[in-house]
Amino acid sequence: MENTNIVKATFDTETLEGQIKIFNAQTGGGQSFKNLPDGTIIEANAIAQYKQVSDTYGDAKEETVTTIFAADGSLYSAISKTVAEAASDLIDLVTRHKLETFKVKVVQGTSSKGNVFFSLQLSL
């Protein structure tokens, strides 16, 4: 697994604290969204996304990893296109409004082909 060092986050990734957050996300990953019940609400204080190249079954591909940093120090991560798209917009919104804490709802759905997918909502 190779990290391509492209990071988008709600925090400054150039500071020591920001770099530690990214390091912890990349090396620890946290709990997978797959293990969360539908509708789980995470009291978050940061979100980050980074690209990594994964080699699954000899098929190398670049993927976006999304990590939500909970206020209690927990990390929640997903490799999911729908989560990545929602999180990218959420990062922009949180950054634009300078939110220090926010509630993220993890939503689970099923596609017309029966595949389970995840997305994010901002909870009030």
Swiss-Prot record:
The keyword DNA-binding applies. GO terms for molecular function: DNA binding. The keyword DNA-binding applies. Single-stranded DNA binding protein required for the elongation during viral DNA replication by strand displacement. Displaced viral DNA strands are transiently coated with the ssDNA-binding protein and therefore protected against nucleases. The latter is then probably removed by the replisome that performs lagging strand synthesis or during the events that lead up to the recombination process. Stimulates in vitro DNA replication several fold. Has helix-destabilizing activity since it removes secondary structure from the ssDNA in replicative intermediates. Belongs to the phi29likevirus single-strand-binding protein family. Monomer. This is Single-stranded DNA-binding protein. It comes from Bacillus phage phi29. The gene is 5.
